[in-house]
């Protein structure tokens, strides 16, 4: 019931001082109140939901899309007894965002993550969602955008090339001392945070040593968006490298006004044994 959801999420909420928009979203989600949840969206809103299970995605645009998204979701969330939100990070600094890890295996949502990007008016203009739900119907093939030019695309092209070449120095060109990378492993429930260039270097040095066998590397979804009025530039990436133990992964990159990566939220599924623990 909605009461179960409210109580399940309440404990997680206690630890945070979330912004007004997130507070409303949280409460509206808990009561499954679609009308209330829509207060946080606008006609510029876009919600992208990717299912790791079958590599398909659904895109919901504008107010009508957001309404359809949550109507469909709340119907699917029939049994909330397993609902948990182990990580909620509300980022007040630009770009304003929320990084969420949640799950509800009792309703088929084995693993889920959302990144919310807010505009200056406190509306959710982008929401990238990855779920692992084996029972969900197949949706559309995921989008890989064509390069359009612009600072975000330039940084992304460099990042992609540097990643493929495992060139740490080249990859650092896209980051600044203010950059933050959060990496959450849904298998081990561990979150590691990297802040600043030294930490970013450590992050990719470790990752590249982990990615010892690239034969299984794939990136089925790459969505690059330049900044627009009131909305930061971003990239939504879904990738995997099961040959190196990375069975599922997704990154949402949020860019600063200069086209550098300000925030990067990474969620992986990597068995602990593979991580050398």
Feature locations, PLM:
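Structured segments of extracytoplasmic/periplasmic soluble domains
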Residues: 40, 73-76, 162, 174, ...
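N-terminal leader/targeting signatures
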Residues: 22-25, 56, 66, 70, ...
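Tandem-repeat/low-complexity and Cys-motif detector
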Residues: 11, 28, 58-62, 90, ...
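A short gly/proline-enriched turn/hairpin at secondary-structure junctions
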Residues: 45-60, 72, 180-195
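Short, aromatic-enriched amphipathic alpha-helices that serve as compact interaction elements
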Residues: 13-33, 148-167, 174
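A beta-strand edge to alpha-helix "cap/lid" segment located at domain peripheries
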Residues: 2-9, 13, 67-151, 157, ...
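Short, well-ordered alpha-helical segments enriched in acidic and aromatic residues
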Residues: 33-50, 167-184
């Amino acid at each position: 019931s909605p009461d179960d959801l409210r109580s399940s999420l309440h404990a997680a909420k206690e630890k945070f001082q979330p912004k007004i928009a997130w507070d409303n979203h949280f409460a509206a989600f808990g009561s499954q109140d679609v009308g209330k949840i829509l207060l946080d969206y606008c006609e510029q809103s876009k919600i992208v939901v990717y299912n790791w299970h079958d590599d398909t995605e659904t895109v919901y645009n504008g107010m009508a899309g957001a309404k359809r998204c949550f109507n469909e979701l709340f119907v699917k969330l029939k049994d909330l007894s397993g609902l948990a939100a182990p990580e909620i990070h509300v980022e007040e600094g630009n770009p304003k965002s929320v990084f969420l890890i949640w799950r509800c295996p009792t309703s088929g949502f084995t693993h889920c993550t959302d990144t919310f990007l807010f505009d200056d008016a406190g509306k959710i203009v982008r929401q990238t969602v990855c779920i692992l739900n084996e029972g969900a119907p197949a949706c559309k093939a995921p989008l890989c955008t064509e390069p359009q030019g612009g600072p975000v695309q330039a940084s992304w092209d460099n990042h992609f090339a540097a990643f493929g070449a495992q060139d740490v120095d080249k990859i650092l060109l896209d980051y600044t001392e203010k950059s933050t990378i959060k990496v959450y492993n849904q298998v081990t429930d561990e979150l590691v945070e990297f802040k600043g260039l030294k930490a970013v270097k450590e992050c990719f040095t470790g990752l590249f040593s982990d990615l010892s066998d690239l034969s299984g590397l794939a990136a089925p979804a790459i969505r690059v968006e330049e900044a627009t009025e009131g909305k930061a530039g971003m990239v939504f990436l879904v990738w995997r490298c099961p040959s190196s133990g990375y069975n599922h992964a997704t990154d949402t990159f949020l860019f600063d006004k200069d086209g550098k990566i300000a925030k990067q939220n990474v969620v992986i599924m990597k068995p602990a044994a593979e991580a050398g623990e």
